[in-house]
Each structure stands twice: as C-alpha cells, then as structure tokens.
Amino acid sequence: MGMNDTPSADRIHIGFFGRRNAGKSSLLNAVTGQNLAVVSDVKGTTTDPVTKTMELLPLGPVMMIDTPGIDDEGELGSLRVRKSYQMLNKTDVAVLVVDGKTGPMPEDEALFQKIREKKIPYALVLNKLDDEEDGDNGSGRLSSQLPPECPVICASARTGRGVNQLKECLARLGKQEENSKRIVGDLIEPADFIILVVPIDKAAPKG
C-alpha cells in the first residue's frame, strides 16, 4: 500500500487552530508546499475544516487540518467556533497559530487551556514575523508552559521563516502519538452506539 493509500485512521492528525487572520491557512500552505487552503485578508475565509494528506518525514503519513477562526462572530460564527473546538477530538497534534504582531488574545488562551486539558501535544507558532529580527511578542504565560522539546516558533508563512523548524517539531510530537493510535481511529464518535460482534467458532481466525 502506497503512502497516499494510507487510511485516515492510520494517519497522525495535525490540526491548525487560532483566531481569524492569524495566518493558519497560509502557514498550512507553507508546510504542505501546496495552495491547499484559501488565503485572504478578509476575516473568516475558512468556514469549514479543510484536510490534506501528506507525508511528513521522518514521521510518515499525516493528515493536516485547517480550521475556522476561534474568534468568529454572530450566530453562524459561533457554530464555526464550535466546529473548530470539536476538531480537537480528532487531533493528535495541535498547532496554535498566533498573530506575532499582536501576541496572544483571550481566545488564544482559552483554546490553549482546552488543548492542555485534553492532553494533546502542541506547538505554539507566532506567525507573520517576516523580519528575522522580529522576536517573541508577548507570548508570556503560553510560552512558559510549552514542552522543552518545542519552544515558541517565530514564523512567517510569507517568507518561509520557521517553516522547517515547525515541520521538525511536528514530527517529534507526532512520534509521541504514533504508538497510541486507536484501531477504530476516526470511525466512531463519543456517545455513538457500537455493536461488537465476537465470533464463537473455534475455527475463526484470531485477532
């Protein structure tokens, strides 16, 4: 079976989360090397989760997930925010993308805490730092709680700054989850009614 034929359930799911216009879609495009997600200066361009399968070396087959902004507004916006949070249930590794020019906002901090509650391995990316001299802009409490193997990543989807560092970080975090993937993967959801059929024939194959 080729890499492109790997079932979704056997892939490490990497989700990109953050506020509108934090540059999630641009960063995802930079990581995948493709124009997968629509990019625009207009807030709320991503209205539904977008997925892309790829190979992330040395990890292997992964599924990248772009999500709607967690600060969307209005009745429809609230539904999009809820959908983004629901995607955490399918995420093995989370990427919290923060606008490096403004630093983390309350919505970022709320998402960060939810990611930690779910014990999802994560990386914090300060995006839009086009100048190599631009550094950590007030990530504060968020960066102080990051695992030592993944420090704050200063990045620019436009210039490519930090993209390789992010790939390496995701590969390390993904390795931690690789052996804990469930057999059923994304086939069932919480509260689903499941019937388990067990063969009682002694001649039935084991497994």
PLM region spans:
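Conserved G1/Walker A P-loop phosphate-binding module
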Residues: 1-78, 82-90, 117
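Conserved Switch II/interswitch segment of TRAFAC-class P-loop GTPases
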Residues: 72-73, 88-110, 119-136, 160, ...
